[in-house]
């Protein structure tokens, strides 16, 4: 399995397994393959989200507190 495929599988599992939204920093810390500086991690994550969406996987984006404009979080709602 390629590194990218492994990272996409691990990202999918992490986003499915959580009940709350995961921040990018949590994702970058917990999923192997997000390496380099912050900008390269961001670009990689955006490509990964696009790849998952092109496969029909719906990624929810939400915040932790609707009153405050907190950092966005991500999850996949189980069907």
Model-derived regions, located:
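Short, basic/aromatic recognition patches that contact phosphate-bearing ligands
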Residues: 1-79
